[in-house]
Design a protein with these regions (language model features):
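Divalent metal-coordination and catalytic microenvironments
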Residues: 1, 9, 21, 54, ...
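Di-metal (Zn2+ and/or Mg2+/Mn2+) metal-binding site signature of metallo-dependent hydrolases
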Residues: 1-17, 24-26, 30
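Histidine-centered active-site/metal-ligand motif
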Residues: 1-6, 61, 91, 144
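Hydrophobic packing residues within well-ordered alpha-helices of enzyme cores
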Residues: 10-13, 31, 101-104, 158
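Short active-site oxyanion
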Residues: 15-20, 87-89
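Binuclear metal-ion centers of metallo-dependent hydrolases, dominated by the metallo-beta-lactamase
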Residues: 20, 32-46, 129, 133-180
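Core dinuclear metal-dependent hydrolase active-site scaffold
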Residues: 41-105, 173-180
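Metallo-beta-lactamase
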Residues: 78-135, 143, 147-149
Length: 180
């Protein structure tokens, strides 16, 4: 979605690496106006790329860009299902808990779900546990916490609650890798 902590230097990286950014249509248009190659999408839309398939889902969150003091609407925030080699990862994006996560879990065999736990701007620990239950992933990974004081959370508390609810979780640090 179109917040600075997500857009970051995506345009510069895309230009440098001759990469294409796939994102919601409003944000795609903005990034394209800055020189990036994009593939615009929408919620519910999927795209088969060379090695992967992506499908965008709803996320409940704001989405705007501050472009030199002007606030620009960035389209709807999204989550994304990424499928490659028969494995599916669900990145929930910045979101609150919403009941259609049940449908995402019902219609997709999710190997790994990546869920926010930071609270304040996204769901917190307890709602993330509910989301994990609804999604039914084999493995869950927390995200969007401890980047700013306002989203300080204890990921071990999340992991304990997740395990007590009978689900698997993994706390990852920068540079960690996981086998899907």
């Amino acid at each position: 979605h179109a917040h600075g902590d997500h857009v970051g230097n995506a345009v510069e990286l895309a230009i440098r690496d001759d990469a294409t950014i796939i994102t919601g249509s409003e944000l795609a248009g903005y990034l394209q106006s800055k020189g990036a190659k994009t593939i615009p999408t929408g919620i519910g839309g999927s795209k088969d790329l060379e090695y992967i398939k992506v499908k965008f889902t709803q996320a409940i969150h704001s989405s705007s860009i501050n472009d030199n003091g002007t606030i620009i609407y960035g389209g709807l925030a999204t989550g994304i299902l990424i499928t490659a080699e028969g494995k599916t990862i669900f990145h929930a994006g910045d979101t609150g808990l919403f009941s259609d996560m049940k449908l995402i879990g019902e219609f997709n065999k999710i190997d790994i779900s990546i869920l926010p736990i930071g609270d304040n701007f996204t769901m917190g620990i307890d709602d993330s546990i509910i989301a994990a239950k609804w999604l039914g992933a084999k493995q869950n990974v927390p995200m969007h916490y401890n980047t700013f004081p306002i989203v300080k959370q204890d990921p071990n508390e999340w992991l304990d609650k997740l395990n007590k609810a009978g689900m698997n979780g993994l706390i990852m640090n920068y540079g960690d890798e996981i086998e899907v």
